[in-house]
């Protein structure tokens, strides 16, 4: 039986899903609205990969760690060029009080701290050239990857076809298959469709209720410096990446629903200020540089910071169903063979590989117990069900 799928969006999410499906026998067509793959948020020179925790949310922290551990192990086995990624560690600097609370939170969860992270003090921080009297988390498997190199590697497969400059404006079911139309009236048909276009879910009638906020992020970089720099990713108010591609990259700003595409001097100054606590000498160096390059892109984030990964409802059937019917999860009105993966926020390169691996298992009808637990957690329809006081149904769409 021929298996084919159209994937909208060729950033890290679309490319990862294409990779997993192509390697299980699917013919994949990637439809990208821009001139090339990895042109949006996945097009920065570097992506820092480390978990970002939330206090008092064990479920989120465990899901974050699960994604982080999967992603770093997976990338390490892909066969990327060694100059395109390094997992030598990553440090997040924390205030003393916050670090103590987080340590308690993590120790009471399902985290094997010794293998994954270590809470470190200022004596260790100073070994990494930082001017800190705070504490920090050292993620032993953290690091960075070249996003464009990773995406190109993932789609280098005979089962994957890439079509650029294809802006999809509509999705509808016609004659038992999905029909996609572009802005210039091209038509694509397939039995299966996956929407992986970050913050543009609202473009389509079928997914316009899946709200995300757009966060503008500006990064900056300068040419290699004449003095010693940290050898691993360091995160404080901003982040500083190790030397790569003859540049040092730092950032990033985080502006909600700000759609200015220009590199702004005010944001460059914010990024410089954010690294003062990481490396005083580099901070001083950036203050006097006349040419500091940069890039702007957007991240899509959900209200609860949990991504949308899975299936979506048939809106017409959903509106007709009663609450007691919707409470029966085996009666939920899912659309056949339409999937979404979006809302990863600033943790796209940590979340997306694991989430698309799970989504590929859903598409292949080959779900493990852990996959079902993850899809329960990322259910795209959770808000609509919770709004109807169906909190249990929202997080138990699969029986585990």
Model feature map: region roles:
Residues 1-5, 23, 397-398:
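Extreme N-terminal leader/targeting segments of oxidoreductases
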Residues 6, 13-24, 33, 41-53, ...:
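Active-site substrate-recognition segment that forms the wall
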Residues 55, 81-92, 118-157, 253-258, ...:
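Helix-loop-beta segment of a Rossmann-like dinucleotide-binding subdomain
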Residues 56-67, 95-99, 137-153, 262-267, ...:
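Short beta-strand to alpha-helix junction loop
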